[in-house]
Amino acid sequence: MEKAGSTDFHVKKFDPVMVAPSLPSPKATVQLSVVDSLTICRGIFNTLLVFNAPDNISADPVKIIREALSKVLVYYFPLAGRLRSKEIGELEVECTGDGALFVEAMVEDTISVLRDLDDLNPSFQQLVFWHPLDTAIEDLHLVIVQVTRFTCGGIAVGVTLPHSVCDGRGAAQFVTALAEMARGEVKPSLEPIWNRELLNPEDPLHLQLNQFDSICPPPMLEELGQASFVINVDTIEYMKQCVMEECNEFCSSFEVVAALVWIARTKALQIPHTENVKLLFAMDLRKLFNPPLPNGYYGNAIGTAYAMDNVQDLLNGSLLRAIMIIKKAKADLKDNYSRSRVVTNPYSLDVNKKSDNILALSDWRRLGFYEADFGWGGPLNVSSLQRLENGLPMFSTFLYLLPAKNKSDGIKLLLSCMPPTTLKSFKIVMEAMIEKYVSKV
């Protein structure tokens, strides 16, 4: 378990400015898909990318990225507009051409203060721009970019996008395009495609999409912590081989790690054995539609898979059993979406809506953020920043799967909002489960 130990710092922000597309953009109202309009997609992406200083010491990263933002909005012109609510609760985008919000900032310290983005450090909150919680949806900027300079020349780029206009892959596509324009490219290498009607159902009356109610936050009775845990690639591969020998079918790294985490977290939290626990995880559905969604589509094209089990059965069962439950959840979602229309079964949470009983896994390993190169190499680190209230995340059930510092090293798990004693128990359970397989060597 890696101990978080980041340093507090202060960010000086200059007045925000609006950055309009560098060329006139179409004035129109474009529709969002039914998936974009889901309540679960009303959140905000806050992505932070950390970079070393540019090799060219005369380069001004603030100016470069501000100009790149103006250029990329020509191709992503809907993002220069505003969201609008329709009568039936769905959303649309009014392409106003107003532009994106751009913030320049600076820190009187070196980039080393960001060496550990796994920490719940309130200082990190200053590295992105936050709308007030009561901001009307019509007043949200669809793109906000904050560039923060450090005394060593390193920079942090914070990008904020509403989930309603893109999913994780779509957000990474936009950031990559922004980086390409910063490098001097004439246009993005991947043409952005809006076409949200591709995900609308043939029969709106038949539309029943997976949604889940808000999850009750944990009672703040004790200090909560956040930590990371790396599972090396050799361990993952060996466990995969062991499991595949048992079931005679392919198992992915995600399935093995997700099952491992689900069991270990459930045991560490000491959830009553009579209760149910649920594992939620998003799946990219772009290739499952008929025809598949085109490359460059940056709207929400994800579905949420749900794996549920009784606590006693999960803890008494094998790793393979948990993997098979996860496989079934994936298969069920694929079956529902492998048609030309968006249709799934209605869903309700049968887990008492307690945050401990629900774990949402978010896999960031292949979204594309780590490939963003603004002209001075790839990012040192990438992080999804959650809004903190009173020093704690507003959403406490997410666990992120990230590449380790060196991608070939394995998978990094980022756990948050768990008491330090529980984090310690989680580590012990994880190591014991891994040792059970590795000791067979």
Curated annotation (Swiss-Prot):
Keywords: Acyltransferase, Taxol biosynthesis, Transferase
Any one biological process term the GO annotation gives: paclitaxel biosynthetic process
Gene Ontology terms, MF aspect: 3'-N-debenzoyl-2'-deoxytaxol N-benzoyltransferase activity
InterPro entries, alphabetized: CAT-like_dom_sf, Plant_acyltransferase
The reaction(s) this protein catalyses: 3'-N-debenzoyltaxol + benzoyl-CoA = paclitaxel + CoA + H(+)
Signal peptide: none
Pathway: Alkaloid biosynthesis; taxol biosynthesis
A Pfam family it matches: Transferase
pH and activity: Optimum pH is 8.0.
Residues forming the catalytic site: 163, 373
Domain of life of the source: Eukaryota
Keyword Transferase: yes
EC numbers: 2.3.1.321
Family: Belongs to the plant acyltransferase family.
Described function: Catalyzes the stereoselective coupling of the surrogate substrate N-debenzoyl-(3'RS)-2'-deoxytaxol with benzoyl-CoA to form predominantly one 3'-epimer of 2'-deoxytaxol. This enzymatic reaction constitutes the final acylation in the taxol biosynthetic pathway.
Protein name (Swiss-Prot/TrEMBL): 3'-N-debenzoyl-2'-deoxytaxol N-benzoyltransferase
Gene: TAX10
